[in-house]
């Protein structure tokens, strides 16, 4: 499975450097000089990192295949991806890679079927996007109080939603 580790933003300067919106907890491992990253759309890459640096909390990256600002502008919005097989296992049993959660069935603590995890959003609060009946979607804050059990081996997530949460998506 391919996982997004970054999204290319606008060019920085005239020599082909781009800003990268980092979408990984370990950018120091993902954005290493010499590493070739696959892309989405796939026909744009792979892109080989020749330089990277932090500037005002932004990651700036230069790719071998991008000689100037014009070429860099063409990459705006392209996703940088890695194969999930490259990821090391997590040490904390309460941490999960997004791809481990997507596709799990969701049920309440009472055993009522709710739907399936279709995405994980990383905003101020991590949210599970749960697709329910008739295509409805509900956002469930990914906190222990509301998600007391994640059993990837059994393929399920148990939620304890407050009154009204599940009705928001219907």
From Swiss-Prot:
Binds ribosomal protein uS19. It comes from Thermobifida fusca (strain YX). Pfam families: PRC_RimM, RimM. The keyword Transmembrane does not apply. This is Ribosome maturation factor RimM. GO terms for molecular function: ribosome binding. Keywords: Chaperone, Cytoplasm, Ribosome biogenesis, rRNA processing. GO terms for cellular component: cytoplasm; ribosome. One of its GO terms (biological process) is rRNA processing. Belongs to the RimM family. The PRC barrel domain binds ribosomal protein uS19. Residues 93-165 form the PRC barrel domain. It comes from the Bacteria. The gene is rimM. It is found in: Cytoplasm. An accessory protein needed during the final step in the assembly of 30S ribosomal subunit, possibly for assembly of the head region. Essential for efficient processing of 16S rRNA. May be needed both before and after RbfA during the maturation of 16S rRNA. It has affinity for free ribosomal 30S subunits but not for 70S ribosomes.
């Amino acid at each position: 499975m391919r996982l997004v580790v970054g999204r290319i933003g606008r060019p920085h300067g005239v020599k082909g450097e781009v800003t990268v919106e980092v979408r990984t907890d370990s950018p120091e491992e993902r954005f290493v000089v010499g590493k070739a990253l696959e892309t989405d759309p796939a026909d744009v890459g792979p892109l080989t990192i020749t330089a990277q640096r932090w500037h005002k909390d932004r990651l700036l990256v230069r790719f071998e295949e991008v000689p100037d600002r014009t070429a860099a502008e063409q990459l705006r919005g392209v996703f940088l991806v890695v194969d999930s097989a490259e990821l090391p296992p997590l040490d904390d049993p309460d941490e999960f890679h997004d791809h481990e959660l997507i596709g799990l069935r969701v049920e309440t603590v009472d055993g009522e079927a709710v739907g399936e995890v279709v995405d994980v959003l990383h905003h101020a609060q991590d949210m599970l996007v749960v697709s329910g009946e008739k295509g409805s979607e509900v956002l469930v804050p990914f906190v222990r109080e509301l998600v007391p059990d994640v059993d990837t081996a059994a393929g399920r997530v148990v939620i304890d939603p407050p009154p009204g949460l599940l009705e928001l998506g219907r």
